[in-house]
């Protein structure tokens, strides 16, 4: 019985083995046809992608696609013309639909319809040439810094920027916003050096030094309930998002600034009521807190971006700046006057010393004349 079962299995497997052997023979003959260049040329049919890519075709003479004799010439021509294969029935090339190009060229196995080249990528752009995709999520990187490294290929939305204040060096600083409103120039063109080159000179609590910037400030102190005049009382544009259904941003409500900018998830009401300061304000609108530490930024540059809400002390005193364009300090003026007085005194002494030899001969000659007259 064992021999009968073996013979039956061999009889059953023989057609499969013969078919497999015939397929291998056909494959070998196809390779030979590929070497000889005897693949069928079917003009009017799409090119065989596998043949164009490898130079071989497993279907041989039964392949229904075209097999050009010089496939390298076909590849070069397609690159020059920018043509891509149309393979009806195959999935469409997503990269081709988005950009209108395909790095695989004629060897791509997907369909490239000519009337849909770059149709998905034809979207409107904002003022910075980034794509506007209303149905997609906002690009967090673009909202945070105002740029996007992916450019036109980014799949997220890039909303229009409502203000150029996002590009300032110190975001949310009322000083830079005030400078923009006064000069009419973009605030980001003001560097720290150019602003501090000729700062206001604070002299005495009873008044403020007159100068080119004197019109921006008022003299005297301000009570806690009064609104200070100066840089910090000037209006500025609100560039933070308003989200009515969300909680209010506590940092924004307290200081008027928000480090997260347009990506903050909290509400930033435009009509924010500034709480009255809990201390006396100086003539430039900065808080005087004698028991608190000195504001480092104010001590260096004479300004403070937090304004009346700063928790440090901003005393009124004379600032000395190491800048040629800055106003000279009283100590330097006194030193210059002392030097001038010393030079004048030395000049007078030297002139008197030089005058003595000229006067002595005259006196001597007069005495000699008197003596001669007596004799």
Swiss-Prot record:
InterPro entries, sorted: Plant_ZF_CCCH, Znf_CCCH, Znf_CCCH_sf
PROSITE patterns xrefs: ZF_C3H1
Record key words, sorted: DNA-binding, Metal-binding, Nucleus, Repeat, Zinc, Zinc-finger
Keyword Repeat: yes
Gene3D superfamilies tied to this protein: 2.30.30.1190, Zinc finger, CCCH-type
Zn finger (C3H1-type) start-end: 42-70, 87-115, 133-161, 243-271, 289-317
Listed transmembrane segments: none
Annotated compartments: Nucleus
A single GO molecular function term of this UniProt record: DNA binding
GO CC list: nucleus
Renumbered residue ranges of the record's region Disordered: 352-375
Name of this protein: Zinc finger CCCH domain-containing protein 57
Species assigned in the record: Arabidopsis thaliana (Mouse-ear cress)
């Amino acid at each position: 019985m064992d021999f009968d079962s073996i013979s039956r299995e061999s009889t059953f497997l023989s057609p499969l083995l013969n078919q497999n052997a015939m397929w291998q023979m056909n494959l070998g003959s196809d390779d030979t046809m590929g070497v000889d260049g005897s693949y069928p040329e079917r003009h009017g049919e799409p090119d065989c992608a596998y043949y164009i890519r490898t130079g071989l075709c497993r279907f041989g003479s039964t392949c229904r696609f075209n097999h050009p004799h010089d496939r390298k010439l076909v590849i070069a021509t397609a690159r020059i013309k920018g043509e891509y294969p149309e393979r009806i029935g195959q999935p469409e090339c997503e990269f081709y639909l988005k950009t209108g190009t395909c790095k695989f060229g004629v060897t791509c196995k997907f369909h490239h319809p000519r009337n849909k080249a770059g149709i998905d990528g034809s979207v409107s752009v904002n003022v910075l040439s980034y794509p506007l995709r209303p149905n997609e999520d906002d690009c967090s990187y673009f909202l945070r810094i105002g740029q996007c490294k992916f450019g036109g290929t980014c799949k997220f939305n890039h909303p229009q920027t409502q203000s150029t204040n996002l590009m300032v060096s110190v975001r949310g600083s009322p000083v830079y916003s005030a400078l923009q409103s006064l000069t009419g120039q973009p605030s980001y063109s003001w560097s720290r050096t150019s602003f501090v080159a000729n700062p206001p000179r604070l002299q005495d609590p009873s008044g403020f030094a007159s100068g080119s910037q004197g019109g921006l400030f008022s003299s005297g102190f301000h009570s806690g309930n009064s609104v200070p005049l100066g840089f910090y009382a000037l209006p500025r544009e609100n560039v933070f998002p308003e989200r009515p259904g969300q909680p209010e941003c506590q940092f924004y409500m307290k200081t008027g600034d928000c480090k997260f900018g347009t990506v903050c998830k909290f509400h930033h009401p435009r009509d924010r009521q500034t709480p009255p300061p809990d201390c006396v304000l100086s003539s430039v609108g900065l808080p005087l807190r004698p028991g608190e530490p000195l504001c480092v930024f104010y001590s260096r540059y004479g300004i403070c971006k937090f304004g009346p809400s700063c928790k440090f002390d901003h005393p009124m005193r004379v600032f000395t700046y190491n800048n040629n364009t800055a106003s000279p300090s009283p100590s330097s003026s006194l030193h210059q006057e002392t030097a001038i007085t010393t030079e004048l005194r030395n000049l007078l002494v030297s002139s008197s010393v030089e005058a003595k030899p000229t006067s002595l001969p005259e006196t001597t000659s007069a005495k000699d004349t008197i003596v001669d007259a007596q004799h």
